[in-house]
């Protein structure tokens, strides 16, 4: 743990129920002990399913009429903000926490990060997950990141490209 420059915690896969908070806090405390920053990396593909089910049910019970995409976006934001609060309670300083919320479609990324920027002043790490191969992945990433960066949203970026079959994994570095 001491050799790493930064830790990444995905709140959706550190455990379920009460174990989730305990395991999340344990990682944060290790970061505190080693004076390391943490990126809270929420990913649409690994959201806390208890949170998603609760929000879907709330949408149905209250007849809110929200789409599943809107609910997933809200869940990502809520997960990131709640995890940030837990990280702070676990001893991390505000300046040690970076937030990312990765989705695979540019409009969703823009929506999520605009709302995150409205609700928090934590540094934001931008990037699409599963952006795609080649020119599609580059175009989707450039489109989403360009809009957000032009608005002053985002502190670090990553372009994640899917390698072509048999292709060089380094292509995403060159992007």
Where do the model's predicted regions map?
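Active-site-proximal beta-alpha core segment in soluble small-molecule metabolic enzymes
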Residues: 1-47, 52-61, 65-68
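Catalytic alpha/beta core domains of metabolic enzymes, predominantly
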Residues: 20, 28, 33, 58-175
């Amino acid at each position: 743990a001491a050799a790493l420059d930064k830790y990444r915690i995905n709140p959706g896969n550190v455990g379920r129920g009460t174990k989730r908070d305990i395991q999340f806090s344990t990682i944060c405390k290790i970061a505190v002990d080693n004076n390391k920053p943490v990126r809270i990396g929420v990913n649409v593909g690994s959201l806390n399913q208890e949170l998603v089910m609760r929000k879907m049910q709330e949408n149905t019970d209250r007849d809110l009429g929200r789409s599943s995409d809107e609910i997933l976006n809200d869940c990502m934001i809520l997960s990131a903000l709640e995890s940030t609060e837990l990280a702070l309670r676990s001893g991390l300083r505000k300046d040690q926490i970076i937030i990312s919320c990765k989705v695979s479609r540019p409009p969703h990324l823009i929506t999520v990060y605009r709302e995150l920027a409205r609700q928090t002043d934590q540094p934001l790490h931008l990037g699409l997950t599963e952006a795609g191969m080649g020119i599609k992945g580059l175009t989707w990433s450039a489109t989403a990141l360009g809009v957000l960066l032009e608005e002053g949203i985002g502190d670090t970026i990553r372009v994640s490209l899917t390698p072509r079959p048999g292709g060089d994994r380094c292509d995403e570095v060159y992007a």
